[in-house]
Amino acid sequence: MDLEGWKEKTALCCRLLQMESLIEASGHISARVPGTDQVIIHPMQASRATIGPRDMLVVDLEGKLLEGEVAPPSETHIHVSIYRHRPDVLSV
């Protein structure tokens, strides 16, 4: 699956978690793109109920923005730290 496919899957997860009331009012969802040093993360400004793949941000394992139109959320460092230290983890 390519990056766009992973962005769609991650956005779908955001919508499903919101629809099923399985996520708190704040917080971010992220996913590691398998075989890469890229992480897809939900931006603070986007609604989890309506988010689509174009809304998702892509950062590297240092938290540097690679793709997207807004700054990564302040919690990005927590997500990427988990991915750096736990290669087996694919989502947070």
Where in this protein do the model-derived segments appear?
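Basic/polar N-terminal segments that are highly enriched at the extreme N-terminus
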Residues: 1-4
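An anion-binding catalytic pocket shared by soluble metabolic enzymes
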Residues: 7-92
